[in-house]
Amino acid sequence: DCHSTDLQRNYDAATDRYKTTFAEMNVACEACHGPGSNHVEWARNPTPGTAADPHHGLVMALDERKGAAWIPVPETGNARRSPSLAGHRTLAACAQCHARRAPLVAGMDHQRDLFDTHELSLLEAGRYFDDGQQREEVYNVGSFLQSRMHAAGVTCTDCHDPHSGKLRLAGNQVCSQCHAPA
């Protein structure tokens, strides 16, 4: 369900077969932002009521970085978020695929909290190399949830461009946004 948008397995117990369907092959807008019909309507008919919609018709706007800045704290050499993080929508959107998890319900409901629809795995022995790098695929949300960075309000999109998956800055520059060089 992470390599296709709106994947439905549709197991048929009578025939012991799956009738799998999907909306789009690969990750598309709706995988993270939810159903797009309201967004399409917003774009087609920009009436005064819809033009003012700050979320542009998206179910999940994922705009937690908007208006946020990382302010250096001289005493620690690190930075703190200002204003503090108001929610975890971005993390939940990323965790749909970037977490070891087991679904508790069928399908993805963008209106519900991911932690109510999935059981997330946390740190387990053998999953990481001694230097902290992952041994397997990019299932890193469980460890991120237990990190100091998460506790400080860092989100996935502070470091990663959500549309490309690449780091926002090259090399150590991404870390230097918040951490002063030693």
Question: Where are the predicted features?
Answer:
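An acidic-aromatic substrate-binding cleft motif
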Residues: D1-H3
